């Protein structure tokens, strides 16, 4: 496969970047496959275009029209999903992984399309009943909801290049607001493929969507009070963006989805070998290995009664040992690589941090087999289970997320202890 150049979509046309930019790689074999750059794009002009062209066109549509528009788009993309699967494989995703991303994303469009039934056939929504604020009803209050007159900027993560885009644009399009989509560059080639089909469909009004495949550094310099910014990614990056002076000055809403230290708790009354115990083990492993653990819903903390700690350890080890790692196109492979070498190095760094206070009891950083691929060329990473026998003292596992097939097993003695451990994840 020759190296292809990703395009950006700005102000109603496809634009080639002024420079070659960043090289993107096949996650399975490490081959260079695309380059991405935003060099030459005028972010301020793109945002004005969205406000002046996309916003009026969407705002004049009723909720019914917007909902039917989303339904038509969902059906259009669903008819073309086979090609999306082909490109998704380059990210290291298995077919099951791609199903979550591609069809899950399209499902979001269908879901928001169906919400039109809860709204009137109008471009605005009157909320609740009028509130009487004076004795003679000469002063009343009533809320009316209308679309913002700005643009939504969606800064997305690398793990769900399709879902991440579609779940967000479904919201802003239904609300009558245009968007600029900024996918994570590492897997932006899959987002670009789907985005091209969206534009080719001619279903959306002009100016509804724009795409930046390369860097979007500086785009927040142009936000205004009617705009909104959404971010999915690391907490560190999110905090920096949230503190941008322009966001603060213009009071721009900033929605952040970042690190998640999700917990799964085995009840005190569950017996090893029971159906509930088996479901627990299966679910932990499934969440560890789906998308190679690159999910915000992945289980990072496994909290179990102290008296069954060893049984859980053994059961997790056995099930993970049967998980074949490799090229997802090869028969029998159940877990592919991480999205790229950069992601692999980041996970290794986080594992090293976690290992300072806890012990690896299942898996290895280096000693594992890969089927149908070279584990050194691809971004492969074996499932890792840590044991933290003192989770109230060694608290790194409640703060550090290794965004891969990594989890920490820890004991508890009472329900109150289990609740306290869950809370230490700070809402995850």
List PLM regions with ranges.
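Short, well-ordered beta-strand elements within core beta-sheets of diverse protein domains
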Residues: 32-38, 55-59, 133, 153-154, ...
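Residue-level signal for inorganic ion chemistry
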Residues: 30, 66, 176, 209, ...
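N-terminal Rossmann-like NAD(P)+-binding subdomain of aldehyde/semialdehyde dehydrogenases
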Residues: 1-137, 322, 339, 347-348
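ALDH superfamily catalytic-core signature
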Residues: 197, 201-202, 228, 237-392, ...
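Rossmann-like NAD(P) dinucleotide-binding subdomain of oxidoreductase/dehydrogenase enzymes
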Residues: 120-279, 412
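Hydrophobic packing residues within well-ordered alpha-helices of enzyme cores
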Residues: 88, 109, 191-194, 222-223, ...
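Residue-level detector of anion-binding/catalytic polar loops
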Residues: 178, 360, 428
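Conserved C-terminal structural/oligomerization subdomain of aldehyde/semialdehyde dehydrogenase
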Residues: 28-34, 68, 203-206, 225, ...
């Amino acid at each position: 496969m020759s190296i292809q150049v990703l395009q950006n979509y700005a102000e109603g046309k496809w634009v080639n970047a002024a420079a070659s930019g960043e090289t993107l790689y096949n996650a399975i074999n490490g081959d260079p496959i695309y380059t991405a750059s935003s060099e030459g794009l005028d972010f301020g002009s793109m945002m004005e275009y969205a406000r002046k062209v996309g916003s009026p066109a969407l705002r004049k549509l009723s909720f019914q029209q917007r909902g039917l528009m989303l339904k038509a788009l969902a059906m259009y993309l669903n008819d073309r999903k086979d090609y999306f699967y082909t490109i998704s494989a380059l990210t290291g995703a298995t077919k099951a992984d791609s199903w979550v991303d591609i069809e899950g994303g399209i499902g979001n469009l269908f879901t928001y399309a169906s919400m039109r039934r809860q709204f009137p056939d109008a471009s605005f929504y009157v909320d609740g009943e009028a509130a009487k604020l004076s004795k003679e009803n000469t002063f009343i209050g009533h809320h009316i909801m209308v679309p913002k007159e700005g643009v939504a900027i969606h800064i997305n993560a690398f793990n769900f290049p399709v879902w991440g885009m579609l779940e967000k644009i479904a919201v802003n399009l239904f609300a009558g607001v245009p968007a600029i989509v900024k996918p994570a560059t590492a897997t932006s080639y899959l987002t670009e493929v789907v985005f091209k089909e969206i534009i080719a469909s001619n279903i959306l009004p002009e100016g509804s969507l724009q795409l930046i495949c390369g860097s979007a550094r500086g785009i927040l310099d142009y936000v205004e009070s009617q705009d909104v910014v959404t971010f999915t990614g690391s907490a560190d990056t999110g905090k920096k963006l949230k503190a941008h002076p322009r966001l603060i000055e213009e009071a721009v809403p900033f929605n952040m989805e970042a690190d998640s230290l999700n917990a799964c708790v085995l009840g005190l009354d569950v017996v090893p070998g029971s159906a509930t115990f088996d479901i627990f083990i299966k679910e932990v492993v499934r969440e560890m290995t789906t998308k190679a653990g690159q999910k915000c819903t992945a289980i990072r903390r496994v909290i179990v009664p102290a008296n069954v700690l060893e049984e859980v350890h053994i059961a997790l080890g056995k099930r993970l040992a049967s998980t074949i790692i490799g090229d997802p196109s090869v028969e029998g492979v159940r877990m592919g690589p991480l999205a790229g070498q950069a992601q692999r190095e980041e996970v290794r760094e986080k594992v090293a941090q976690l290992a300072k206070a806890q012990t690896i009891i299942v898996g290895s950083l280096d000693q594992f087999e890969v089927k149908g691929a070279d584990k050194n060329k691809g971004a492969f990473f074996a499932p890792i289970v840590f044991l933290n026998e003192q989770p109230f003292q060694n608290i790194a596992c409640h703060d550090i997320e290794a965004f891969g097939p990594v989890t920490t097993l820890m004991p508890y003695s009472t329900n109150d202890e289990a609740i306290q451990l869950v809370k230490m994840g700070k809402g995850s």
